[in-house]
């Protein structure tokens, strides 16, 4: 049975002891006299921790043992594509030619960096069937906001400012409604049919002269491919709207079908999902946005251009109707490097194979879990890259919720799936294994879910009180809001006052 390490680990500043040294600088060849102007000289002591290298390594190793990541084991968060991040990506991102350049350098001195951005754009254009990309957005939601801002500007530019409604299916990626609302649109929800795909009749009834566009995730968040996508595109375009592709689930269809060929006008991608760059710590991510030719003049500036005659890459600010910047400078460059390395290592056939295995893994897990007491599968049984089970029968019969199941999974040394999403599935367990887990890991995950089912019906309190073997037990969600402890100093002060007892 898994048991996570738990260390009573102080802050690195608290471990500091005066006089301890982790690194020494070489002596200068000659005496240097540097006079720092008074107005920029520090008034107080530079408070940096003083530790030896072994102490630093032990400190961060202990912290890592109380954590869990994609290198620890299966991490099947649905709609997140938590695949393994190849370490060659990190090697290339740490290359001095990447790590030590500055965005303010003259473009003549960063031709290699601009070439990387140019090549990445060519790959993304080919993969998606789009005509031009901006690499500026910092993440998926930032990409969504960029895309819907382009839609808004396009309609205003065409003399149709009344198009203020954005259609969003109830099975779309979760951030779509928020991004549309932030861009000033009224969000109209389109329901799913009994198969888990867009209800065409409802869509036809919803479109009109106020329709700006439809934001669609395909496959959707149930893991089901929208097989009537061509008809959906026809309905939206006939009404004068644009079709927006949320690339959250692109990992399911690489090399199989392209958004541009399905009728989409705009697409955003997540390099930190499909193209194996890290999700770590909330960023940095990257959410490139691609458009068809008729929308390229609305993209954020600058774009990266290539002068074939002079074999020179350059920053192109000649984008007449640009929506402006959506992030400072040019985007998260080191993330782009990682993604391009992944693309070049995998190649066309490798990407296609990755999607096939991702779909195979999701369907294998679905079939193995199907029929287990307490879990039911809504919609079509054939999935793409992810699957969504409902634990509603278990909740009704035992009182054990989807959240309880997720917490209990932690006791087996496995990361929980996404829970309570999509909202159209009650007590949802959204599982996306990705292509980088083995059959043995899938088998173990299913066995853990089956064992939790047995426990729910024989000894439900074991599940309801989980996790038992983690460094941190179940968090009090209510108290976390009422009395947040967001720093170590705050924790020590509250503990000294007796206001917390952990």
Swiss-Prot record:
Matches recorded under Gene3D superfamilies: 6.20.440.10, Aspartate Aminotransferase, domain 1, Type I PLP-dependent aspartate aminotransferase-like (Major domain)
Keywords from the UniProt entry: Oxidoreductase, Pyridoxal phosphate
GO molecular function, one term: glycine binding
Enzyme class: oxidoreductase
GO CC aspect terms: cytosol; glycine cleavage complex
Modified residues (N6-(pyridoxal phosphate)lysine): 273
Source organism superkingdom: Archaea
EC number: 1.4.4.2
Catalytic activity of the protein: N(6)-[(R)-lipoyl]-L-lysyl-[glycine-cleavage complex H protein] + glycine + H(+) = N(6)-[(R)-S(8)-aminomethyldihydrolipoyl]-L-lysyl-[glycine-cleavage complex H protein] + CO2
Keyword Oxidoreductase: yes
Swiss-Prot/TrEMBL cofactor(s): pyridoxal 5'-phosphate
GO BP term, pick one: glycine decarboxylation via glycine cleavage system
Purpose: The glycine cleavage system catalyzes the degradation of glycine. The P protein binds the alpha-amino group of glycine through its pyridoxal phosphate cofactor; CO(2) is released and the remaining methylamine moiety is then transferred to the lipoamide cofactor of the H protein.
Assigned protein family: Belongs to the GcvP family. C-terminal subunit subfamily.
Oligomer status and interactors: The glycine cleavage system is composed of four proteins: P, T, L and H. In this organism, the P 'protein' is a heterodimer of two subunits.
Protein name: Probable glycine dehydrogenase (decarboxylating) subunit 2
